[in-house]
């Protein structure tokens, strides 16, 4: 008679081994999804009011970023999209690691803030246009006195709460954001349940 295998003689070890494999698969699968498909973020601070609020749970779509990188390109979001990106000024313990803002302008465009109005100038609009008109704006004047031309490989972003110092963004100290720091566009507000909402992607 053939000798029983080790696992046959120790069935509990077989069960434990199967459980370990399952846990490893779950961890690896979660990491892959977070890296390449979507990620979840929580909003902190008032910078995106009246659109997003502290405690809102967001789903960020990683797929367009992943597809761009697979083609050896940088991902460029659309004007007006709400995006999450790595904070260029981040240092442990002093700043938020990731920020959420709205895309205002792209490389080569000139952005001005004057008398409470944000204006973008480009080849298509040499006299300038107000991007806030496309999404009903922040609902309040834009603070600051700014004039900047967006450098290559970067975007100009701003919060929706632009009065005073509620939003650190490209107007007032954050600077323009490198495309390689963009994590992805916000596709869904998942929480609170009473405010579930999809966003432009």
Regions found by a protein language model. Name each.
Residues 18-36:
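Hydrophobic membrane-insertion alpha-helices, especially the h-region
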Residues 2-17, 36-42, 50-201:
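Soluble "head" domains of membrane/secretory-pathway proteins
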